Amino acid sequence: MRPDPDAFDGGTASRRLFGLYPALVKDIVDPDATGRIKVAFPWLGEAGNDVTAWARLVSLYADDDQGWMILPEVDSEVIVGFEAGAIERPYIVGAVWNGKEALPQSAEAANNKRLLKTRSGTLLEFDDSEGAAKVTLQMQSGHKLVLDDAAQSVTLKHSNGCELVMNTAGQVKITANSTVEITASAVNVHAPIVKCDGIVQCTTLITQSVVSASYTPGAGNVW
């Protein structure tokens, strides 16, 4: 049942509205900086665009200088309820897809995935598939972070193909398309052996001993 439009006449509280009602977001910048959202009521007909109210947004968490802050987009559809039915005290209790705005991902019967996707295409996805749980953080550009329980790996990947992988064997693999640079006051490597496929070049080499199958004479090459 639709509420009586006259309940909003003059903004008075002469009538009360119980239940939940659809509304359209018109403004998200509260002039009082209290987090309210300005909404209009399309079920009032053409007059609904002119009848607006500043509604408090129900959040998962709200406290002093902290909380869960995700505001709805202007012109998106939300659901509004009224405190004790008082029309001058509206609350936004949630947002809905209405057929015009599509879901970020089609629903599946297994219902394994939970996700948050933003306007720019940034995606945070939790996959609860049995034995293959996975968390993925991905940018539309292709940058990606994957925590994969099935593969027992953590992968950080740049859109250009550079990659850092930590796997279940305890290996850390770095793949770069160009150089890998380390800048620090000191770098300590603790390992019984360090292998290099190419040339090792340094300004100064201090060593306890050298074992080599060949020797190239040159400045500083004094044994």
Regions from the PLM with identified roles:
Residues 40-45, 51-55, 75-79:
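Catalytic cores of peptidoglycan-degrading enzymes
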Residues 8-14, 60-65:
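Asp/Glu-centered strand-loop micro-motifs enriched in Gly/Pro and often flanked by an aromatic residue
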Residues 17-31:
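Structural detector for short beta-strands of small beta-barrel domains
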